[in-house]
Amino acid sequence: MTDAAPNQPVNESQELSKSFEPAEIETRWYDEWAKRGYFDAGRHVETGTDPQPYVIQFPPPNVTGTLHMGHAFNQTIMDGLVRYHRMLGDDTVFVPGTDHAGIATQIVVERQLDAQKVSRHDLGREKFVEKVWEWKEQSGSTITGQVRRLGASADWPREYFTMDARMSRGVAETFVRLYQQGLIYRGKRLVNWDPKLLTAVSDLEVQSEEVDGHMWHILYPFVDGPQTIIDAEGNTVTLRGMTIATTRPETMLADGALCVHPDDPRYKHLLGKLVELPLCDRNIPIIADDFVDPDFGTGCVKITGAHDFNDYACALRHDIPLIVIFTLDAHINENGPKQFQGLERYEARQAVVAELQAQQYLVKVEPHKMMQPKGDRTGVVLEPMLTDQWFVAMSKPAPAGTLNPGKSITEVALEAVADGRIAFYPENWTTIYNQWLNNIQDWCISRQLWWGHQIPAWYSEDGQVFVARSEQEAQEQARAAGVAGPLTRDPDVLDTWFSSALVPFTTFGWPEDTPDLRRYLPSSVLVTGFDIIFFWVARMVMLTMHMTGSVPFKHVYVHGLIRDADGQKMSKSKGNTLDPVDLIDGIDLEGLVRKRTFGLMNPKQAGAIEKATRRQYPDGIPAFGTDALRFTMAAYATLGRNINFDLKRCEGYRNFCNKLWNATRFVLMNTEGHALDGDGGELSFADRWIVSQLQALEAEVERGFADYRFDNVANALYRYVWDEYCDWYLELAKVQIQQGTPAQQLGTRRTLIRVLEAVLRLAHPVIPFITEELWQKVALVAGKRTAGAVASVSVQPYPRANPQAVDAEAEAAVAELKSQVEAVRALRGEMNLSPAQRVPLVAEGPTDVLSRNAPYLAALAKLSEVEVVAALPDAGAPVQVVGDARLMLHVEIDVAAECARLDKEIARLEGEIAKANGKLGNASFVERAPAAVVEQEKARLAQFSETLEKVRGQRVKLGA
């Protein structure tokens, strides 16, 4: 696509600069693309056509700071797909957005206030929320800037924030409808509670950590005096009471019962009897339930329904009282004995254990490893807490009048994957998705925070609840119900993942039936890390299908997580994070140290982090540019695996960009000023070969995009550009331009520029900036745009393989030429010739092939001449055999000196072989050395042996 305009961001008369400097190019071209509207839906497609939509939604980054390497990886994959489909002619929509990230954002802003010795309670809710909005504006613009730096061709007019007015409307509408359908309800339930944040947290936000704890064994005396039981060995045993074991003795203050298995013969006669609750003026019953393991410990457990998830279910089944013993900040409340009231939970533990021991209720204490649940945001040990919360019913059948009546939202989500409407890449994630949905619990969606979507529910003074889209609507409901007086809004906010789950359809205008919603839902693919399949992916499927009847996306591409070079998770506390912008622009050592040691949760870690950073990056991080970073990310994108990120890979792909730049300079120098549009000219076998290879590249790249194998795309581009086009074809083209006829020169020049132009289009989705800059110059010469016209590679047709251009004969001819060149280079190495020394080659074999290849051999193997003979002379020189050809360098040598040199080399190699055999024959070395070191030594031995055989062969040819 081209459109005439006077302003072209490239000086067409200026020569391409000598070196690739990405910074200036990136800023200039991103602004230009956005200004021209290439990223906007519908703007880049041909008028009068009805292209198919191709839609990708950002997984919205949290507005809690800056993008990390995982975001850079995600953006590379998503933008690569979008640019590819834009060039295919699809109507691409790449929807950007950011997430309000309730808990995470509130923590960040509260920390800022803490530094000023101010709490959110000092400010009040309204002022605090204002502060968060201020911070969001600052952080959100930083993130947007970073996304642009990564080259994301996003449809910026569609940018959203999950608390924008239009998004908030969709959230409220969804909540109200689900409530009216009986699929959202409020109830007193046991939840994971963060006593620092004072909010419920999702099961998925719980991180379990193994710790060294204790098991306390406590005696609960029988109220009726000692009882007898028959133990497992058949002995009659008299018990003063029941002994239970617990890792949390402080919670015994809330016990409601003791429980045994109903089929445990030891305790059947004790069912219904009462025991004393130590330290409390209460008696509790002995009950039976199948959940008890009779073979674990004494086969008796305590039931603390308000502070343990297993106990909670048991207590409900048996109507056992739920006694809450903790305040919301985890101190003993008024339900505990007076002596413990007001104590923090761990202080209470010490006091309870001391009192149990003093009153002889403590039987014994044992060390015990245990899993401790912690909040992933605060690291605080979570407390099961009985509170009033809002829930989404995950397994309840939807009522009549909904889009899927009689089916739960979970059933519908499972069916969408089972029948192929949604496909996972790689496929194994389907199993994980299904396992989670088949074991799902109702979703607690309320959070006791100030930042987020406030729950659209209002309460009357007598406790009636009115769920409505607005306070006015709630008032109308109250009046209709005969309720007078003020209404108070529920202070809680919704789980961040609730609003995020609505993104696939609320971003396109739902609940209105908009043209965008009809055209762009479902998205084509969701690109995401496996860590949020449950948090986000499954919930998007459930809610999108329930509210709209459509799947949210057709494909889910699941990638691994970015780790450091040693495979460690990147985290601020480890000091091993990398900012993608630092890899693009570079950062000096002092700046990197400051960035890694600033704002640590534990400032004591700063010294170790600084030391490690100075050791790892003594010169800081060089500027690689966006294209090199993107190429690196694409090359790492194997299906589903975690990625150990190594900066050396970035350096390699920066070198690739330099190679492409320099190749373009060479091509332009040899093609500019020549009339290369139209047909004509004579194509050599080398010209036909590089065009034939291009077809294979185009097919491989197309297959890679279709299969989400971005590593294959990147590797195919790298191999073709570096190995085939630059290292071989450019060298062959030099020969053809210098020695060919005018028709041959024209054919080669046309091939040089046309293949390069196609390569730039092929590589554009991966490395957009350098390809745009180079294409502007190359396209003029290749006849793909006219001088003065505005055009962009980003909206050019994507190259497709042409089977008619595959040339097996040319492929075979170049393969043979390559083998001959490499054979002559091997001869030069064997004869220890310097690179500058030009020597003649004598060749025996097929005359037509050798004569055709002679000028290329002379140029690429640094030969003074190539003589084709009927038979090689008996000169005692080494010979290389390539197919039917025999090749020999005709070099006059001092035989005595060469014999002496070879004898010396033989002695050296024999010494190396003896040393290697000595090591490998040493059992201690083989057993104790790392396997990699042993394998390396074996490889050295094999290499020395192979070289020795060749050198001995040369020595034999020279005689005594």
From Swiss-Prot:
Keyword Kinase: no
UniProt family annotation: Belongs to the class-I aminoacyl-tRNA synthetase family. ValS type 1 subfamily.
Stored PANTHER family: VALINE--TRNA LIGASE, CHLOROPLASTIC_MITOCHONDRIAL 2 (PTHR11946:SF93), VALYL-TRNA SYNTHETASES (PTHR11946)
Catalyzed reaction equations: tRNA(Val) + L-valine + ATP = L-valyl-tRNA(Val) + AMP + diphosphate
Superkingdom classification of source: Bacteria
Sequence motif 'HIGH' region, location on chain: 61-71
Molecular-function GO terms, alphabetical: aminoacyl-tRNA deacylase activity; ATP binding; valine-tRNA ligase activity
Positions annotated to bind ATP: K572
Subunit structure: Monomer.
Function per UniProt: Catalyzes the attachment of valine to tRNA(Val). As ValRS can inadvertently accommodate and process structurally similar amino acids such as threonine, to avoid such errors, it has a 'posttransfer' editing activity that hydrolyzes mischarged Thr-tRNA(Val) in a tRNA-dependent manner.
Protein name per the record: Valine--tRNA ligase
Motif 'KMSKS' region, chain ranges: 569-573
EC code(s) of this entry: 6.1.1.9
InterPro entries the record matches: aa-tRNA-synth_I_CS, aa-tRNA-synth_Ia, Anticodon_Ia_Val, M/V/L/I-tRNA-synth_anticd-bd, Rossmann-like_a/b/a_fold, tRNA-bd_arm, tRNAsynth_Ia_anticodon-bd, Val-tRNA_synth_C_sf
UniProt key word Cytoplasm: yes
Enzyme class: ligase
A Pfam family per the record: Val_tRNA-synt_C
Subcellular location: Cytoplasm
Transmembrane segments: none
Gene3D superfamilies: HUPs (3.40.50.620), Isoleucyl-tRNA Synthetase, Domain 1 (1.10.730.10), Valyl-tRNA synthetase, C-terminal domain (1.10.287.380)
Residue runs in coiled coils: 893-958
Stored HAMAP family: Val_tRNA_synth_type1
Gene Ontology CC terms: cytosol
Domain notes: ValRS has two distinct active sites: one for aminoacylation and one for editing. The misactivated threonine is translocated from the active site to the editing site. The C-terminal coiled-coil domain is crucial for aminoacylation activity.
